[in-house]
């Protein structure tokens, strides 16, 4: 039996490359985002280095989305073309044996040659976590925004979020110089709920503008503490008043929760538990 974890020896090369998809988790604390960039550590580059070592040739990894510096992922999706004879379902184990501890491959699967992690996706879902207890928690700190300065009313935040559902021009929550040609977003779900000392804001859309969720949360906190009425929040983005959106919530509270596909190539257990406790077991109840 071939031991595919022993990748120091060159694997047999196949004539026809196969396309392999991955479900990836990472803690974004020590990364300058997903995308490869000179002189900075990125998730894409860390995985590509291992893939290239195993494949004995340069390998490019294509992600479903580009998370920013400090943003986490519970289920990023990416694909690459493999020429070695390693079965697609074994790539998760092969990679996990070599990757640093802040990256984990949840699953790997064979996909069609024209399948694309980004362009085949129909939606992405992000969650932002706010920790509201006045007492600091070391284990919670890397994964949430510790906000205890004033009480937050999650029902007011939900009232503000509901009108966002639908296709809208959200230029008010779009950072400048992003390179995107338009700011239309089809928001499929937007919800805010409390779990003990944690407030979670989840948004699902066909795509996201650069910095969109963090800018949204930054002003939704004003709604939650009663400084901005929900209807004024709606007027702000309807009238594209970008100059009034001045603060982005810290990156560490944001997590790419899941990427949706019409026909998912992954088994159900590839997706991590999407309940609020999935990132902080025993700490969020």
Model-derived features: where do they sit?
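Structured-RNA-binding interfaces characteristic of tRNA pseudouridine synthases
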Residues: 5-6, 15-285
